[in-house]
Structures are given as structure tokens and as C-alpha cells.
């Protein structure tokens, strides 16, 4: 009797160890599969149109703590999953009667918000280099390999990057649209434009990197440019020498000193003058009688004192009164403020550029980078922005090599990591619409009608309206040193507001550089064309909710000795 009992006991002990081993193996395998699925599922999101549905894998991973919360700020999260606003402990944050704060913790709402490459339907496509077409050398002559190692680049008129599908023809077309003569490719993914060839030609073997999207085509190397001429036959290239009318302006006192180049020609036209100035890489073409002048905006000719266009009317041979001139914007970019770099030494002051999503943070970064000459960083990574020239996107956000760091975070711990911050505020009505458009159609697109008419829009407003308010309240409460900037003031009074921002960043900037920024103020991230959704998207209930938050933020700003919100924020 004892022997069978002993055997049974021995078997059960072995079974316990076996079950323990199988359980550990099961948990380890499940964790590895979860991580692998998360990595595979995120790129697949690129192929699907934007919606507000949560990613199950990302949600599970966040719940078990396997993935970094910064990589899972999913813009497509279902509103049912969005956590809500903590009860703010400060007197300034008391909720006025009638405002219903959501019931869950807002930290999850911030965590699920994502500025990641995979969140943007307009991000780089999944098509790899293998699917690209053959090289397009016939669309422009290959001029050779050139060195660009100096501080001052020769080809700097237009710059963009594409880490996944850069081709020779892609760069040529981009330069042709801006009326440049030469297109240079560097490091396999960088495109530069200009009207003058670099001075130093090197061996063809030194341009040994293939284009990221075109096997067999050389796209330069580190500090080496493969330069092509831009052919007029480029498909997709716009008409050359087009110009945009800027207005009628008084002539400066010293024309010769203010206008760098000129020509006189009978029956000179806008296109002729624009072409002449574009070839010389000037952003302004000025017409006065039969004379054509080329110039940059300067303190002596700042384009801020426009007069009635009738004074420059072209009804006579003299073409208007002698003291006035017509000014046109050429397709050529003002290059005096396009040079940017990382900080030479790590910054001692860690500065945030904080805003609610949709408040114009990317546009503000464009202005700051071109004004200071230093890259801005980001708490997130957005491949689309990197491809558009925001090189700081790839730098670690805590590297301190950038002039400031973009963030939409608003928790106490996240705020207190920064020594100071520029707090960018925008009208919540416009911010909500802008962010909804970005979620559904990318940085430059518009959400289709089906999204506005679905349950997604009211759920989005109910979840995000409170975040707009709590974001400002938290930064006012926990921020160590703040500069409050209103988006509307930045747009209406760009140079004075930008000058204040640059001073806050402790950078000295010339007036010419600020005027250059003003001349290039739009950048590449403004939605073009008319909004296709003309109807009022906000219901009376939505307006009541948002208006309550506006009053709360306005009072909080005043309590902290800041001016209140602009008048256009006043409840509708």
C-alpha cells in the first residue's frame, strides 16, 4: 500500500514542476507574440483610411505595460476607451455650473493621442523600393557629383526628405514646380534645389548611395550631391515663372541700394520680370514702368505699407504714378532663413512648445526653426514631418540638441520635466475641427462628410473639448516659466509675436531673418483650398459644453496675470 502511494506522490510532484514550466513558457511566448503583433499591426494602419476605432493590439499592450505609452497615442482610439479628467485641485480649476467633466482619467486620452508615422493617412506609403520604376535619367541631364561640405550650401532653395520613396524624377519635379534649374540629391533621401551649380566637382564614385525609392539610380552620399538639370518636359511640372501679386507699394528712397538687381526692357511683362528674378534666385519681382527690379524683403522695403492698387494701374505707358511699384512673389524661396542645424552644445534650458492638438504646433515649429536657424524636437515621432524637413523629429526628445520640444502632454510629471515652455493656445472651435481633419485625413486633408455625420464627431468633441481646457489649466498650474502665445495673434501680427518667442528662447535674430520668415510664413503644412464641409459642425449642446471651458480658461489666465483669451474666443 505504501509503494503505490509513494509513486502517486512522486508523479504529482513531477506534474507540478511540469505545469509550472508550461505556464512560464506560455507567458513568455504570449509576451513575445504580443510585441511582434504590435510591431506588425502598426505599419498596416498606413493602408487603412483614418477612423476613430482603437487598435486592439495596442490597447492590450498598453494595458499590460509592454509598450512605451508615448508610442501608443493612437489618434484612432474609440471615444469609449478615452479616459477622462481628474478633479483639478486648484481653485482656478473649479468647474463652473453646467460643465460636465468626463468621468475617467485624462492621462489615457493623452497617451492614446499619437503623432507617429503610422497615424497619418498621408504618411509614407508602404510601397518599397522594390516596386519602384526604372531610373528617370532621360527627364534631365545628369551633371555629376559635387561636394557640399561648407557652412553655406549652393543648392538650398527648396529642401525636403523622403526616407522611403525618393527618386530622381520626384526631386526634379519638386524643383521644377518652384522654377529651379538644378535638382541635387544627397544621402539617398534628401532633395535640394537651386539655380547655381556647387563649385566643387568630385569623382562620380563618391556619389555611391542608391535612391531610397529607385534602385540603380545614384542619390549622392554624405555631403555629396548627385546633381541633375531640371527638364522643361517634366510631367507634372507647373508653368515656369508664375508669380503671385503682393500689392502696390511706395518705392524706397534708395532704389539702387534696396533692389539688388534690375533690367530695363520695352513692354516688360510680369512673366518676363518674374523669370528674370527667379533665375537670379530672388523671391520678389518689382515692376515700375519698363523697369524690372529683383529684391528681398528688407527693413527698408518690408511690404507692410501697401497702398491702393489704382496707384500702380497699368493703363498708360508710364504704368502708374512714378513713386509706386507693383510687387510680385516669384516661385523661388527666400533662402536667407532656410539654413538650420542642431544646437552645437546641449541646451542648459529644456524648453517645451506645448499646445493642444490642432492648435498650430507644427506651423509654430516651422516659424521658430526658420527664425532661429535651429531644429525643433518632438516628444513623438512623425515620419511625415521628418520627410518635410523637420530633422529634429528623429532626434531623441531629451537630447537637448533642439531649440525646443513639441509636446501635447499635460500631466504634472510631464510638465515639470521642462524648465520653461511656450504655451500655444488656439480657439477650441478651430482646434477641434483641425484635429478631427488630421485624424481622418492627415496633416493636409479634410475629413469627408461621412465622418462629420457619423457618431465619431460628437464622441470626439465630448472627449477632446475637456482636454483643451485641462491642457491649459495644467500648464498654468505646474509650468515653471511660461510664455503664453495665442495662435490668432501669431497669424495676425507675426513678426512682433515671433520676435517675442525668439527672445524667450534666448536667441538673437536679425530683422532681415524675421522678414524672411514672414515671406515664407506658410511652410508646407497648411491645408489648401476651401473647406469642403461648409455646414456648422457644432450642435447647441456642443457649444454649451465648449463655451463653459472657454470661460474657465479665460478666468484662469487672468488669475495668473496673463491677458484673457482673444475676443474671438467669446462664446458663440
From Swiss-Prot:
Signal peptide: none annotated. It is a single-pass type II membrane protein. Residues 116-135 are annotated as: Disordered. This is Sialate:O-sulfotransferase 1. Residues 139-231, 242-337 form the WSC domain. It is found in: Golgi apparatus membrane. Sialate:O-sulfotransferase which catalyzes 8-O-sulfation at the Sia-glycan level using 3'-phosphoadenosine 5'-phosphosulfate (PAPS) as a donor, forming 8-O-sulfated Sia (Sia8S)-glycans. Displays selectivity toward glycolipids such as GM1 gangliosides. The chain crosses the membrane at residues 15-35. Disulfide bonds: none annotated. Glycans are attached at residues 105, 254, 345. InterPro entries: P-loop_NTPase, Sialate-O-sulfotransferase, Sulfotransferase_dom, WSC_carb-bd. GO terms for cellular component: Golgi membrane. It holds the Pfam family Sulfotransfer_1. Residues 36-572 are extracellular. GO terms for molecular function: sulfotransferase activity. Belongs to the WSCD family. Residues 1-14 are cytoplasmic. It catalyses: a ganglioside GM1b + 3'-phosphoadenylyl sulfate = an 8-O-sulfo-ganglioside GM1b + adenosine 3',5'-bisphosphate + H(+). Its main location: Golgi. Keywords: Glycoprotein, Golgi apparatus, Membrane, Repeat, Signal-anchor, Transmembrane, Transmembrane helix.
Amino acid at each position: 500500500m505504501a509503494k503505490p502511494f509513494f509513486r502517486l506522490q512522486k508523479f504529482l510532484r513531477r506534474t507540478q514542476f511540469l505545469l509550472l514550466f508550461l505556464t512560464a513558457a506560455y507567458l513568455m511566448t504570449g509576451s513575445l507574440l504580443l510585441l511582434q503583433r504590435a510591431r506588425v499591426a502598426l505599419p498596416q494602419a498606413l493602408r487603412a483610411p483614418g477612423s476613430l476605432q482603437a487598435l486592439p493590439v495596442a490597447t492590450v499592450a498598453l494595458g499590460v505595460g509592454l509598450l512605451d505609452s508615448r508610442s501608443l497615442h493612437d489618434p484612432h482610439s474609440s471615444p469609449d476607451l478615452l479616459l477622462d479628467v481628474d478633479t483639478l485641485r486648484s481653485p482656478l480649476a473649479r468647474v463652473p455650473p453646467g460643465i460636465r467633466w468626463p468621468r475617467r482619467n485624462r492621462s489615457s486620452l493623452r497617451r492614446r493621442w499619437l503623432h507617429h508615422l503610422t497615424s497619418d493617412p498621408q504618411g509614407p506609403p508602404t510601397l518599397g523600393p522594390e516596386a519602384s520604376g526604372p531610373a528617370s535619367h532621360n527627364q534631365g541631364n545628369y551633371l555629376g557629383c559635387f561636394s557640399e561640405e561648407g557652412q553655406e550650401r549652393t543648392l538650398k532653395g527648396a529642401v525636403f526628405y523622403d526616407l522611403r520613396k525618393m527618386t530622381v524624377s520626384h526631386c526634379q519635379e519638386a524643383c521644377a514646380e518652384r522654377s529651379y534649374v538644378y535638382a541635387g540629391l544627397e544621402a539617398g533621401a534628401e532633395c535640394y534645389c537651386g539655380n547655381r551649380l556647387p563649385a566643387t566637382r568630385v569623382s562620380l564614385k563618391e556619389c555611391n548611395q542608391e535612391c531610397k525609392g529607385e534602385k540603380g539610380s545614384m542619390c549622392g552620399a554624405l555631403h555629396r550631391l548627385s546633381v541633375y538639370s531640371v527638364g522643361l518636359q517634366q510631367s507634372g511640372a507647373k508653368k515656369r515663372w508664375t508669380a503671385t501679386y503682393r500689392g502696390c507699394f511706395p518705392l524706397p528712397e534708395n532704389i539702387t541700394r534696396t533692389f539688388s538687381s534690375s533690367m530695363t526692357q520695352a513692354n516688360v511683362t510680369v512673366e518676363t520680370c518674374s523669370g528674370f528674378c527667379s533665375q537670379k534666385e530672388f523671391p520678389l519681382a518689382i515692376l515700375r514702368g519698363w523697369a524690372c527690379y529683383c529684391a528681398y524683403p528688407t527693413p527698408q522695403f518690408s511690404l507692410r505699407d501697401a497702398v491702393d492698387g489704382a496707384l500702380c494701374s497699368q493703363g498708360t505707358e508710364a504704368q502708374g504714378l512714378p513713386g509706386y511699384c507693383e510687387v510680385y512673389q516669384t516661385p523661388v524661396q527666400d533662402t536667407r532663413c532656410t539654413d538650420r542645424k542642431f544646437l552645437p552644445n546641449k541646451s542648459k534650458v529644456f524648453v517645451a512648445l506645448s499646445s493642444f492638438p490642432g492648435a498650430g504646433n507644427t506651423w509654430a515649429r516651422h516659424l521658430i526653426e526658420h527664425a532661429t536657424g535651429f531644429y525643433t524636437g518632438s516628444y513623438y515621432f512623425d515620419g511625415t514631418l521628418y520627410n518635410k524637413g523637420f530633422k529634429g523629429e528623429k532626434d531623441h526628445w531629451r537630447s537637448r540638441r533642439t531649440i525646443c520640444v513639441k509636446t501635447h502632454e499635460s500631466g504634472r510629471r510631464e510638465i515639470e520635466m521642462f524648465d520653461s515652455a511656450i504655451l500655444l493656445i488656439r480657439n477650441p472651435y478651430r482646434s477641434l475641427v483641425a484635429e478631427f481633419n488630421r485624424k481622418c485625413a492627415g496633416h493636409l486633408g479634410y475629413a469627408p462628410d461621412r465622418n462629420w455625420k457619423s457618431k465619431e464627431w460628437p464622441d470626439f468633441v465630448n472627449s477632446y473639448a475637456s482636454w483643451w481646457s485641462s491642457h491649459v489649466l495644467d500648464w498654468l498650474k505646474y509650468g515653471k516659466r511660461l510664455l503664453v502665445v495665442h495662435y490668432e495673434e501669431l497669424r495676425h501680427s507675426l513678426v512682433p509675436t515671433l520676435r517675442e518667442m525668439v527672445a524667450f528662447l534666448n536667441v538673437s535674430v536679425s530683422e532681415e531673418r524675421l522678414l524672411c520668415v514672414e515671406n515664407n510664413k506658410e511652410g508646407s503644412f497648411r491645408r489648401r483650398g476651401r473647406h469642403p464641409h461648409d455646414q456648422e459642425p457644432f450642435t447647441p449642446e456642443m457649444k454649451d459644453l465648449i463655451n463653459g471651458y472657454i470661460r474657465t480658461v479665460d478666468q484662469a489666465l487672468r488669475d495668473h496675470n496673463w491677458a484673457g483669451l482673444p475676443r474671438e474666443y467669446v462664446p458663440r
